């Protein structure tokens, strides 16, 4: 919410995930500086994290702030599902002396940023050229599984907010049926997020151990990735392959649901760390493996987002739209990413 429109700059921006919070100052339109990443577990509340950030960067008076957050938003009270923070938006605004404090879903923020991402921060994984006036889909595994989209609206774009990561996982082969049974016995409902997340990667590895009659080594996600990428552990490598395959199926479903011929974007913190493995993985095959609709999906480009802080421009755009003296958001030009580039261009 906001009260009035005092000092316009700098503006405080945030992107809060389940594990880390990234904060920055926008000192002029599109100029984002002083980016810091803070560990959520170090701070009792969001307010404490914000105060520490402002102290570290020596920020002068800040009046307006917006934060993308990895959580559903419904009213003033926020209880984070993947973090211990629980807070009132209005109470936090007052405590920090802000005139404006907006919260939006983190993947809505990332969706708003998609048309603003430079080509050098995207790596194309298959498909053709994007259609300029078609929807854009966004999916990304991290601490959880974020899903969003941009749809054409009034000469610009409108972001869709939802909880698509919690849709039901459907296995596609016997091995995946075994994984579903393993997860279902422990959790009941098996969502895509249950498997397509950091903890999901560990769960996949444990399930494979159980299916093979091996001891369930409780490996952390980073250990599964490292052993799989190095080839030191065949079961870890299979877990990575299945992870990419399941992500391909989920991304293909999303593309069909939205008609996302403008492209499907992969965000989140996990896939960029898979280096060239992702390009050679079953992802693209499973993305297109939709029977009669396979040819439709074969033309849709997939872009891996390689930017270190991709959501912050979207947070800035949301805040700018809120503060601008007009009723409708300013149109955003359609992205025109040319065909080319590979997942080998990515960086961690």
From Swiss-Prot:
GO cellular component, one term: cytosol
Record GO terms (molecular function): ATP binding; D-glucose binding; glucokinase activity
UniProt name for this protein: Glucokinase
EC identifiers of the protein: 2.7.1.2
Region (Disordered): 327-348
Signal peptide: none
Catalytic class of the enzyme: transferase
One Gene Ontology biological process: glycolytic process
Catalytic activity of the protein: D-glucose + ATP = D-glucose 6-phosphate + ADP + H(+)
Binding annotation for ATP: 14-19
Any Pfam family: Glucokinase
Keywords per UniProt: ATP-binding, Cytoplasm, Glycolysis, Kinase, Nucleotide-binding, Transferase
Family under the similarity heading: Belongs to the bacterial glucokinase family.
Cell compartment(s), UniProt: Cytoplasm
């Amino acid at each position: 919410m906001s009260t009035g429109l005092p000092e316009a700059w700098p503006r405080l921006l945030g992107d809060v995930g389940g594990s880390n919070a990234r904060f920055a100052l926008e000192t002029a339109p599109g100029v984002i500086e002083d980016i810091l990443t803070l560990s959520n577990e170090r701070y009792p509340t969001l307010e404490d994290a914000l105060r520490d950030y402002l102290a570290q960067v020596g920020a002068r008076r800040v009046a307006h702030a917006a934060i993308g957050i990895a959580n559903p938003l419904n009213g003033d009270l926020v209880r984070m599902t993947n973090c211990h923070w629980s807070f009132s938006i209005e109470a936090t605004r007052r405590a920090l002396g802000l005139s404006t404090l907006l919260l939006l879903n983190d993947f809505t923020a990332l969706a708003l940023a998609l048309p603003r991402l430079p080509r050098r921060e995207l790596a194309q994984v298959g498909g053709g050229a994007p259609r300029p006036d078609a929807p854009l889909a966004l999916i990304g595994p991290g601490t959880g599984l974020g899903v969003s989209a941009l749809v054409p609206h009034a000469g610009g774009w409108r972001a869709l907010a939802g909880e698509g990561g919690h849709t039901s996982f459907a296995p596609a082969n016997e091995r995946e049926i075994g994984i579903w049974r393993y997860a279902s016995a422990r959790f009941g409902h098996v969502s895509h997020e249950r498997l397509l997340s950091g903890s999901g990667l560990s769960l996949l590895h444990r399930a494979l151990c159980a299916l093979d009659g091996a001891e369930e080594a409780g490996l952390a996600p980073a250990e599964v990735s490292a052993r799989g990428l190095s080839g030191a552990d065949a079961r870890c490598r299979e877990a990575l392959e299945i992870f990419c395959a399941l992500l391909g199926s989920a991304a293909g479903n999303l593309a069909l649901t939205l008609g996302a011929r403008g492209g499907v974007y992969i965000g989140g913190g996990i896939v960029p760390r898979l280096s060239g493995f992702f390009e050679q993985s079953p992802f693209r095959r499973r993305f297109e493996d939709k029977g009669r609709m396979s040819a439709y999906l074969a033309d849709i480009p997939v872009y891996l987002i390689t930017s270190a802080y991709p959501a912050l421009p979207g947070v800035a755009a949301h805040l700018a739209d809120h503060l601008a003296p007009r009723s409708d958001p300013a149109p955003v030009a359609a992205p025109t990413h040319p065909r080319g580039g590979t997942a080998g261009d990515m960086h961690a």
